[in-house]
């Protein structure tokens, strides 16, 4: 598993990266990078580091600059226009898994053991799934931990992939229960 969180532009890019590597991925949704997304990227940078992999075009470079300006110290992975070209379209979503792996290796990504600190029983115990207010509780805990909102399965993945400690998790739950 790649240690750093990979930041891409959109959902199709997420799919392409997931075909290539096991990693936590944030999709910024194009130019509409809002404060919530930037804060998730900042938190990811603090916890594991971030690698930005955007399309090899003007829009991709602009998004890369916006993120770089707001989140210092991130790494950058690049694909060429030729590597990302298919049927008249240029983008990460068109790159082969081999090209994406090579780009991440050039960005000096780190490999780590997949972590399983948390499981579904933790979410059930803390009423983050299987409870009428589970969605609101996950949203609040996600905000406290800087991992954002997600469904139960994705929330569990983020807890494990972002390196959240059990102590941090319990403290976040306590803060929302006040």
Language model features: what each stretch is:
Residues 19, 23, 31, 35-178:
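TOPRIM fold recognition
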Residues 6-7, 56:
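Charged, low-complexity surface patches
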Residues 2-3, 27-32:
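Short, flexible loop segments at the rims of nucleotide/cofactor-binding pockets, characterized by
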Residues 1-3, 15, 36-40:
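Phosphate-handling DNA/RNA-contact segment within nucleic-acid enzymes
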Residues 5, 23-24:
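Well-ordered beta-strand positions
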Residues 1-5, 48-51:
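Short active-site oxyanion
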Residues 10-13:
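Short, polar loop motifs at secondary-structure junctions
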């Amino acid at each position: 598993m790649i240690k750093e969180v990979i930041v891409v532009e959109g959902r199709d890019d997420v799919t392409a990266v997931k075909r290539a590597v096991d990693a936590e991925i944030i999709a910024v949704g194009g130019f509409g990078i809002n404060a919530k997304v930037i804060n998730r990227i900042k938190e990811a940078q603090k916890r594991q580091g971030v690698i930005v992999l955007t399309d090899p075009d003007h829009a991709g470079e602009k998004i890369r600059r916006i993120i770089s300006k707001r989140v210092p110290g991130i790494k950058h992975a690049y694909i060429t226009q030729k590597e990302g070209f298919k049927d008249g379209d240029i983008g990460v979503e068109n790159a082969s898994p081999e090209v994406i792996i090579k780009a991440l290796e050039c960005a000096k990504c780190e490999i780590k053991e997949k972590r399983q600190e948390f499981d579904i029983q933790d979410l059930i115990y803390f009423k983050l799934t299987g409870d009428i207010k589970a969605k609101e509780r996950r949203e609040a805990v996600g905000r406290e931990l800087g991992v954002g909102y997600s469904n139960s399965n994705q929330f569990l993945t983020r807890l494990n992939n972002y390196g959240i400690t059990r102590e941090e998790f319990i403290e976040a739950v306590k803060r929302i229960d006040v």
